[in-house]
Structures are given as structure tokens and as C-alpha cells.
């Protein structure tokens, strides 16, 4: 009879929560480690320590010693990393072979990087999913143990996709554990299809009206909602973030430059011309003054014929 394995989880994000709850309910969770400074996750996970699960706050500089202590004191069979922000050292990988596995919240090898959720939505991918892979010295390059795909719908935001993937991660645990106990080594990644996307920077979360069409901007707004409170544009030195938008079809061609405000009223909404003579209605925006319907920006001086510019 195969013994019930003991599993420790290293995490830094709410996406790990359903999996933590599932492992705890099944009596498999032997420890949790959370990156220091993440008060939201630390506060949530404190309930685990109250129920007897050892809880470790991991610092960046001494993480190898802390992780080693966690493994040794709990006799964990497997360590699952779920959005853990730092690499596992070569020494730990050598000393504890076939122990460390990463939950990558995107499809490998084509969606490597720090935020595959953002990139999947921004690129309007047709599907996404979770890839569980063995951790080795190279980031996101280990052998794939299990991959689960889901369709990526056109209304999915960064936040809603994170929630969907978090429950997908919890749902695949049983199958994953069976594979690991069967000593499955996984499938090597095809480097010919590999792509790496760095963590989104300021240029990635700003609109370029002259280069991007309406569908591109609409997808970018969803990719930035809610973590960045939308995608940036600017009017008269005032930063505006577009949280939710709708592509408008069937409008007549307009001679104005991309970024021109074509409508700003309650009836038609806040409509802006984009590249390739496409049109976008800015439904919800965020400013320092708060979240509001796009058309309400008329109270701040924006007018039809005005120009939104790149940040």
C-alpha cells in the first residue's frame, strides 16, 4: 500500500489558497512557507499554524537554510512551489532529488516567465492552463509532470483567471500525487517552441494609441485588471487608467488621430479612436479621484475632439 505523502508548499499569492485548503483537508499538508513581507498571504495562512501545520516565513537572503530546515523538520516528501518568488538553490535540488515541483500558471514551454496570466490575456491566447514541472537550475525549464489546459474566454480578466487557475491547481493535486508516487519523470520541454516573457514593466501597461488597435487595448485592460487598476493613458498631464473597455464596431471612419475622443456622454459613452481606424468605448476608468464610468470624465474637462496621449 502506498503511504500518504507529506507535502510542503512554498507560496506568495492567493492562487495557492485552494490547493492549501485541499491538501490540509486530506491530511497531506505538512508545512507552509511564505515569502516575507507578504502580509496578506501571511495573515491568511496563519490559520494553518493554529491547526497544527508548521508555518515558515521565508527571507530572500537565508531562504536555503530556512527551506532546508522546513524539509528536515517535517520530513516532507514533496515541496510544491506556487508563485514562490525566488529560485531554489542548486544545493537543495542536489540534496533532495525528485522533491521540488513548481506550479506554473501558464502553458509551457511557450509561456515562460514571471506572469503568464498577464501575457496570456494580453496576447489573446485561445487557451491557458497550469503546467507542473520538476524544478531544475533553469527557470521554468524542468521536465513537465502534468499539464492541464482550459479555454481562455474573451471576457477574462487577470483577477478572474487567477481565481480559475487557483481552483484548477487544487483539482489536479490527486492526479499529480499519483504520478509522483509512480516515479514519473515527466516530459522534456521542446525548446523550439519556448518563449520567455519578463515581468511586465511600465511600457507594458501603457497604451500606445498610434500602434495599438481597439482589440489589443481592450485585452491589455483586462490583463491589468485588477492588479494594476487598469492600463495607463494620459490627458492634459492627468493619468487615467482604463479598467474595462468594449470594442465598438460599425462606426464611421474619422479623420482624427488615434487617441481622439469621438464621444463623451451618457448615451454613447466614452469612445476613442484607436489605430487602424478602430474604436473603443472606455466603460470603467480609474483616476486618483476614484473608479467611475468613463463618460463621467466630462466633469473633469475632457471633451469630444480632445486627445488622449501615451504616458
Q: Model-found features: residue ranges?
A:
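C-terminal substrate-binding/catalytic lobe of Rossmann-fold NAD(P)-dependent oxidoreductases
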Residues: 224-273
